[in-house]
């Protein structure tokens, strides 16, 4: 990732071609993040405050079940937005996410 900051209310979205179990690590990530794992716009797992990792080995965070999308946002944002497993997210134009 190599980011040292992420603007408030910004994030990164990763859309996968295939529905599968996804493991995310934080190698070369300098800031803590909340990782949201989704399938069909439904939150299936949520890792809050995933720690930065600058040296291997790094902890891996699993979706625990097959998913098709991952969203990474600033640590703490999922609590501020009151996100929880089972919530649905609508994604418009690949840039705006409605909670």
Question: Over which residues does each language-model region extend?
Answer:
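Compact, glycine-rich, soluble single-domain proteins
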Residues: 1-99
């Amino acid at each position: 990732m190599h980011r040292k900051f992420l603007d408030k209310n910004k994030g990164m979205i990763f859309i996968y071609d295939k529905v599968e179990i996804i493991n995310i690590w934080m190698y070369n990530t300098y800031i803590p993040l909340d990782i949201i794992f989704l399938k069909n716009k439904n939150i299936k797992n949520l890792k809050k405050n995933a720690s930065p990792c600058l040296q291997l080995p790094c902890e891996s965070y699993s979706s625990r079940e097959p998913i098709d999308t991952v969203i990474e946002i600033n640590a703490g944002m999922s609590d501020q937005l009151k996100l929880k497993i089972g919530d649905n997210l609508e994604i418009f134009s690949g840039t705006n996410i409605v909670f």
